[in-house]
């Protein structure tokens, strides 16, 4: 297990950069924090020259990252991209109008769905290696979009932009891969509370070294949605989000009878299942949600559980005193997300299916799945709470998604990934 990362003051006194070669294989690490108010996640990186710690909203989508570029943005290494250059023309959506000579982009907030027009920028970004040296590795030509403070609405209060972890060639993982000639793959481990940090691991397909005990991943194919769900639609592109081939849902081993046609992404981009950190809880289309809740409540009777008054946004809650605590959370029916084969499933235990609500004299455990209505594009959106303390790998070279069930089964947590010094230094 690598030691905790050195403090920022040590980085400022003497920053050691690796001399990169085409065979560079040391993974890079970035801490992930959870925000109590929004229930969203931020990824910490070093940005600018001199390097400055910066927190960005973690998003499993978007074609490019974006950063607040107000009057306080100063960097000796930043430079704009001219219009009508091969680089500018390669972006999925750009604008070179209003007599501007600078390439402009349309950064988007995935939570509020706000967007705006702002200039593209190139600057330095750095992340530490996940080894004994914790050396900073410099990406000197990191491409992103500028944005104004308006676009930060709805994100964590300390977020200064968005880190795109989507399928795009200009996402953060893709630019790291291109710069270091490393595998186009990254691993996520989201923390379950704001008291701890998780981590993102870049430039490596390995995961066995992350924890003291061996943790195996189960894999399923990533599905390409042919139509992106973006605000700006003048140049339609495939989605940068991650869709998986979910074929059924089981509760306590019993399948729900879902209309299978809506579980497949069609040519207009509707249907299917995606993984999202823009949603705090898993969102189910109304017909699926009703089946899900009915079956869960029925199966809960075997645990001697009786529903009580629900707390928004949840539809089913139980008195906290009625649930038995286990090492994987409250004892409730298991939820299995079944993939391309019956023996390939993502099992969700109580720690990820239930949410504790204790406030105003109320103390309940609520089912952490919400009704998404009937008009959504994607009938199943797996949200952040269901992902916490699970190890996930997004391997674009092999077009596959690797996952575990809760790490608590292995007496492990995402906070074991020892990046607390980095995170504490930039809060």
Swiss-Prot record:
In the UniProt annotation, what is the result of changing residue 413 to A?
Answer: Almost abolishes the interaction with XEG1
Sugar-bearing residue positions: 99, 169, 245, 259, 298, 304
Question: Pfam families per the record?
Answer: TAXi_C (PF14541), TAXi_N (PF14543)
What are the UniProt keywords, alphabetically?
Apoplast, Aspartyl protease, Glycoprotein, Hydrolase, Plant defense, Protease, Secreted, Signal
Supply one GO molecular-function term: aspartic-type endopeptidase activity
Its family?
Belongs to the peptidase A1 family.
On assembly, the entry states:
Interacts with the Phytophtora sojae xyloglucanase XEG1 and xyloglucanase-like XLP1. Possesses stronger binding affinity with XLP1, a truncated paralog of P.sojae XEG1 which has no enzyme activity.
Protein name stated in the entry:
Probable aspartic proteinase GIP1
- Please give the organism: Glycine max
Name the gene. Answer: GIP1
């Amino acid at each position: 297990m690598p030691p905790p990362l050195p403090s920022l003051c040590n980085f400022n006194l003497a920053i050691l950069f690796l001399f990169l070669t085409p065979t560079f294989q040391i993974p890079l690490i970035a801490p992930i924090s959870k925000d109590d108010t929004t229930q969203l996640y931020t990824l910490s990186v070093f940005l600018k020259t001199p390097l400055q710690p910066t927190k960005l909203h973690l998003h499993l989508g978007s074609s490019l990252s974006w950063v607040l570029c107000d009057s306080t943005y100063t960097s000796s290494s930043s430079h704009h991209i001219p219009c009508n250059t091969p680089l500018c023309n390669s972006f999925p959506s750009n604008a070179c109008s209003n007599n501007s000579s600078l390439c402009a982009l349309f950064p988007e907030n995935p939570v509020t769905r706000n967007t705006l027009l702002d200039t593209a920028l190139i600057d330095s970004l750095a992340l530490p290696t996940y080894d004994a040296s914790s050396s900073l590795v410099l990406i000197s030509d990191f491409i992103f979009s500028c944005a104004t403070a308006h676009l930060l609405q709805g994100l964590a209060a300390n977020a200064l932009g968005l880190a795109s972890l989507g399928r795009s060639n200009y996402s953060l993982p893709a630019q790291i891969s291109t710069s270091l000639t490393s595998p186009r793959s990254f691993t996520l481990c989201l923390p379950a509370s704001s008291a701890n940090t998780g981590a993102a691991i870049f430039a490596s397909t390995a995961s066995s070294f992350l924890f003291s005990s061996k943790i195996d991943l189960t894999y399923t194919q990533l599905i390409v949605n042919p139509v992106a769900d973006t605000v700006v639609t003048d140049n339609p592109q495939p989605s940068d989000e991650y869709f998986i081939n979910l074929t059924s849902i089981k509760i306590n081993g019993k399948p729900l009878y879902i209309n299978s046609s809506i579980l497949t992404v069609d040519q207009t981009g509707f249907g299917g299942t995606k993984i999202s950190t823009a949603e705090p809880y898993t969102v189910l289309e109304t017909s699926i949600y009703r089946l899900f809740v009915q079956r869960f409540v029925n199966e809960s009777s075997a645990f001697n559980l009786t529903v009580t008054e629900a707390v928004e946004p949840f539809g089913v809650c139980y008195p906290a005193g009625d649930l038995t605590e286990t090492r994987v959370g409250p004892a409730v029916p298991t939820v299995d997300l079944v993939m391309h084969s019956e023996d390939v499933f993502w099992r969700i235990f109580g720690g990820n299916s239930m949410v504790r609500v204790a406030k105003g004299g109320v103390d309940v455990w609520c089912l952490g799945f919400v009704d998404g209505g009937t008009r959504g594009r994607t009938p199943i959106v797996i949200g952040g709470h269901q992902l916490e303390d699970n190890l996930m790998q997004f391997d674009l070279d092999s077009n596959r998604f690797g996952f575990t069930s809760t790490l608590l089964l292995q007496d492990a947590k995402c906070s074991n990934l020892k990046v607390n010094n980095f995170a504490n230094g930039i809060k």
